[in-house]
Amino acid sequence: MERIWNYNRQIKLVILLRNPSDRAFAHWNMQRFKDREPFDFLTALKEEPRRIAQPLTIESRRFAYVDRGFYSRQLERVFKFFPREQVHVVKFENFRDRKQETLDGIFEFLGVKSLPRVRDKDRNVVPYERTIGPEERKYLSEVFSAEIAKLEQMLGWDCSDWKM
């Protein structure tokens, strides 16, 4: 963030946040699809602290399924350099479900002309091996409970849909 701030202190940032449990599961699925992840999802989650404790490398970050979902730490780093007026945080689920409305809000924030209609096409779609199981969902719900509450406070959001 400091390098961006040094480059352009007036820059406007748009940040997209996804339900951290869904993000973790999608991340794991991508690693499985690329044959980089030997563990089942729950084992991978429980092994994560050991795996990412290595010196920071791209390889170790590949397995940061949970760690990357602690958005408040990342946002605090952003807000250390940029005032909130320069940062527009978007909930991924709003973008997915109300794409044009969400994009119009982003365009307005950026001060640019809105596009009449944006083509709706998903990118980087990887077929999921399976859906997330109830035990895994419960585990992640407990892991992210305090984080989600902190985000609700920090952003003034209702994240009840992230608590399931």
Where do the PLM segments sit?
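Surface-exposed cleft-lining segments at the edges of enzyme active sites
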Residues: 53-67, 125-136
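The conserved 3'-phosphoadenosine-5'-phosphosulfate
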Residues: 10, 72-150, 157-164
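Core domains of carbohydrate- and sulfate-ester-processing enzymes
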Residues: 37-51
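PAPS-dependent sulfotransferase catalytic domain
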Residues: 1-39, 57-101, 146, 153-155
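Residues that form generic nucleotide/phosphate-binding pockets
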Residues: 27, 44-47, 139-143, 154
